[in-house]
C-alpha cells in the first residue's frame, strides 16, 4: 500500500512527548523515522512510570510506534561522522533539546545546510527566541501556564488549573507536523530545505485564540455576557475563569446523571443553542419557556442560566448518562457523556475506527495505544510497536555502508 511519506527519511532527535508525538505521526504517514538515542539509556520516557520492571514504559511505547531506534554517541568522532552521513541522506531532522544544545554538538543550522541544503530542520522549544523566557526549561504545564490556558481554566473563585489534555506537549508536536509538511511542499517548489521552529507557548496560545478574542471584548465592554459572572458578578481587567461554561457563545454546563453519587463520571455536558431553544424546552418538559419573555432569548436567560441548568438536571439525574444523550439527541441538542479513560479503552467503536489499537512489542507483549486520528480514503496507517533501544543500530549503519567489522569497532569505542 502506498503511503503519503513513503521514501521520506526523518532523523528523530527528540525525547519525552512534544517531539516524539510529531515524529510518530510522520512514521504513521509512511516516513522512515530513525530515532537517535543515547547508548545504554535512550529516551527518558523508556524508564518513567513503568508498570512492568525493566520493560519500556507505556509512556515511551505510546509515543514512538513505527520508528526505528539506533544508539549513537554524537560526542565521539565516529558518532559525529555517522550523524553527518545520516543528515546527508535525510529529508527531515527534528529536535527538542534545550536552546543551544544541538549547536554545542556541532550541528548548527548553518552546518546542517552545508551538509544537506535540502534538509528540513524542525525545532521545538519552550519559548520563541525573542521571549524573555527563552532559556526557561519548559514542559507540558509550563507551556499551559505561559500560553494562556491555565489562567482561563478552572472556576472563578479558585486558582488557575492545567488541563489533563497535552496542550503543551502533543499539541506542539502536531503544530510542528503541519509546519514540516508545509516545508516539504515548499521544497518541491524551491529545491531547498528550511528551518521550522515551534514554541510550546505559541502552540498553547493558538488553541486559546477565543480567549484572546474575549480579552479584546473585555477591554472594550468591561464585561463578557456569556460568562457565568454576568450580569451579577464582577469582572477584572483580564479574561476570567468560567468553570465549565461554553466558550463559543453557547451556554453549556456539566450536569449530573443517575449514579453520580458513586460514579465520578456519571455526568453529561449539555449545551443550550439559541436556534434550538424551542426543542430544548420540549425535551425538558418546559414548553412554557418557549414564549416566556424571561426565557425566550439568550440575553434574557443569562441572568438565571444556572437555574435553567438546575431544572434540566432534575431530568438528567434520573437516567443513565448514555440514555440521557440518546434522548436529548432526538431533539438535536449538543451533548455528550463524560467518558472515563476506562470506558474509552473498552469502547468497541474506537477499536473499529482505529482510534485505539492493540499492538505487540517483543518484551512487553500486547498493549493499547492511540491510533491515527485522521481517517484517509486512500490509505490506512498501519500502527506498529515502538522499537527496543538500539534495535536497528546495525541495520541502519549497514545501510550507510559500514561493514560488520567497522560496526564492531564503533561499539568497542562506545560510539554506538
Swiss-Prot record:
Function recorded in the entry: Involved in the catabolism of oxalate and in the adapatation to low pH via the induction of the oxalate-dependent acid tolerance response (ATR). Catalyzes the transfer of the CoA moiety from formyl-CoA to oxalate.
EC numbers on record: 2.8.3.16
Keyword Transferase: yes
Keywords: Transferase
Subunit description: Homodimer.
Catalytic-site annotation from UniProt: 169 (nucleophile)
GO molecular function term, any single one: formyl-CoA transferase activity
Entry's Gene Ontology BP terms: oxalate catabolic process
Catalytic activity, as annotated: formyl-CoA + oxalate = oxalyl-CoA + formate
Gene3D superfamilies (UniProt xref): Crotonobetainyl-coa:carnitine coa-transferase, domain 1, formyl-coa transferase, domain 3
Taxonomic superkingdom: Bacteria
Residues the entry annotates as binding substrate: 248-250
UniProt xrefs under SUPFAM superfamilies: CoA-transferase family III (CaiB/BaiF)
Membership in a protein family: Belongs to the CoA-transferase III family. Frc subfamily.
The protein's enzyme class: transferase
Pathway assigned to this chain's UniProt record: Metabolic intermediate degradation; oxalate degradation; CO(2) and formate from oxalate: step 1/2
Pfam families the record matches: CoA_transf_3 (PF02515)
Binding site for CoA: 17-18, 38, 72-75, 96-98, 104, 137-140, 273-275
Entry protein name: Formyl-CoA:oxalate CoA-transferase
Amino acid at each position: 500500500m502506498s503511503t503519503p511519506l513513503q521514501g521520506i527519511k526523518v532523523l528523530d532527535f527528540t525525547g519525552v512527548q512534544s517531539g516524539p508525538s510529531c515524529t510518530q505521526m510522520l512514521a504513521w504517514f509512511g516516513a522512515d523515522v530513525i530515532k537517535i538515542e543515547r547508548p545504554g539509556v535512550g529516551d527518558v520516557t523508556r524508564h518513567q512510570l513503568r508498570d512492568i520492571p525493566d520493560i519500556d514504559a507505556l509512556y515511551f511505547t505510546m509515543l514512538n510506534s513505527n520508528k526505528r531506534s539506533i544508539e549513537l554517541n554524537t560526542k565521539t568522532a565516529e558518532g559525529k561522522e555517522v550523524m553527518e552521513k545520516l543528515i546527508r541522506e535525510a529529508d527531515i531532522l527534528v529536535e527538542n533539546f534545550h536552546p543551544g544544545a544541538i549547536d554545542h554538538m556541532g550541528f548548527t543550522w548553518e552546518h546542517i545546510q552545508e551538509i544537506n541544503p535540502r534538509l528540513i530542520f524542525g525545532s521545538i522549544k519552550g519559548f520563541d527566541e525573542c521571549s524573555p523566557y527563552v532559556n526557561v526549561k519548559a514542559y507540558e504545564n509550563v507551556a499551559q501556564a505561559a500560553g494562556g490556558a491555565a489562567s482561563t481554566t478552572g472556576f472563578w473563585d479558585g486558582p488557575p488549573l492545567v488541563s489533563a489534555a497535552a496542550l503543551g506537549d502533543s499539541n506542539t508536536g502536531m503544530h510542528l507536523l503541519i509546519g514540516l509538511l508545509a516545508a516539504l511542499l515548499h521544497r518541491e517548489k524551491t529545491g531547498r530545505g528550511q528551518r521550522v521552529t515551534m514554541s510550546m507557548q505559541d502552540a498553547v496560545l493558538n488553541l486559546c485564540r477565543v480567549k484572546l478574542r474575549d480579552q479584546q471584548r473585555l477591554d472594550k465592554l468591561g464585561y463578557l455576557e456569556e460568562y457565568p459572572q454576568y450580569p451579577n458578578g464582577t469582572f477584572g481587567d483580564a479574561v476570567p475563569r468560567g468553570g465549565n461554561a461554553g466558550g463559543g457563545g453557547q451556554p453549556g454546563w456539566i450536569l449530573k446523571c443517575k449514579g453520580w453519587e458513586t460514579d465520578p463520571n456519571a455526568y453529561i455536558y449539555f449545551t443550550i443553542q439559541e436556534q434550538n431553544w424551542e426543542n430544548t424546552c420540549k425535551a425538558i418538559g418546559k414548553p412554557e419557556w418557549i414564549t416566556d419573555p424571561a426565557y425566550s432569548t439568550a440575553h434574557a436567560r443569562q441572568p438565571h442560566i444556572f437555574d435553567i441548568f438546575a431544572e434540566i438536571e432534575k431530568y438528567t439525574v434520573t437516567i443513565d448518562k448514555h440514555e440521557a444523550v440518546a434522548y436529548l439527541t432526538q431533539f438535536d441538542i449538543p451533548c455528550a457523556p463524560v467518558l472515563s479513560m476506562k470506558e474509552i479503552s473498552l469502547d468497541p467503536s474506537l477499536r473499529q475506527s482505529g482510534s485505539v489499537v492493540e499492538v505487540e512489542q517483543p518484551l512487553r507483549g500486547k498493549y493499547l495505544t492511540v491510533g491515527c486520528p485522521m481517517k484517509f480514503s486512500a490509505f490506512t496507517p498501519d500502527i506498529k510497536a515502538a522499537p527496543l533501544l538500539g534495535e536497528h543500530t546495525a541495520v541502519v549503519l549497514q545501510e550507510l555502508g559500514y561493514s560488520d567489522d567497522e560496526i564492531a569497532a564503533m561499539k568497542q569505542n562506545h560510539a554506538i
